[in-house]
């Protein structure tokens, strides 16, 4: 079981067993469903696709995110494969492939006609909104009913952070020369060019060193004071935070250039398989953006930019929420997320589902 301890949840106040199922597979991703043992008479709950970041950490970093939504949704999460474990013969993986994967997953989940709601945590915000734009332009019936973008770099020109400034100043060529290595023997991906996860982790840790030291001190204080729950939650999060994976070099370098150097998406210059990604084609999906006041990875306003760029989504189906007092990881993990952010996302998805259901019943297209 990938997500340890997520073997039970509560639905309508009753304990329900949970099992992980792999329902879709590709070389660089498995789609995990958290199948709940609900009675046959239970009404179906909305499908929620949580797109985990491909940024050096495993999907298990989202344990708290998944746990918060399990009582209310049929939850799926992308489990990205460590690039060092993918044989070179299976090809590379770039930003175009990422978007293709998300489109294929949405089609697989929407095959039964039920609406699919999507949630992109941090880095996936760009490929997710691009995938929705591609699907809506094509009139794809499986295009999501809603998308929630959390702490994502939609437009890094707004409130640029140290991460954004470094990427723009160095440029993709510098990263290619200094950060790309080949997977060593005896890993299955021997010879594959990758951006190693330990570089990402060391960069984040150095950026927030005082915060991490203080967090560990607080954990030990909790242990001394007998606050076992808080200390244990902190320990679990750090176990996941310290576990890192390698990224395919093609994806990493294309992301640096497209998102952080050229700002191609907000400029209307981003392409997928040679075709422009036009966010004005998005009309049917509802949109919510979530940011953290103290986020030093995706600055305030970077995710909210999606609200301005999606000009043809009616204003009443667009929402933005800024959570005070939290940084990047507090957007999707911790007590503020559970008490303040998750309930707002649930309400947003519920409203979006009702709009899509009314549209389907009347035979009209939401616009």
Predicted regions and their residues:
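Conserved alpha/beta-hydrolase "nucleophile elbow" surrounding the catalytic nucleophile
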Residues: 119-121, 125, 292
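Short beta-strand/loop motif that positions the catalytic acidic residue
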Residues: 282-283, 288-291, 295
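Alpha/beta-hydrolase-fold enzymes
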Residues: 112-113, 131-250
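Conserved alpha/beta-hydrolase "acid-adjacent" motif
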Residues: 296-305
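Conserved acidic catalytic loop of the alpha/beta-hydrolase fold
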Residues: 85-89, 99-116, 128-133
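Catalytic histidine-centered segment of alpha/beta-hydrolase-like enzymes
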Residues: 297, 321-339
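Short, surface-exposed "cap/lid" segments of acyl-processing enzymes
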Residues: 6-86
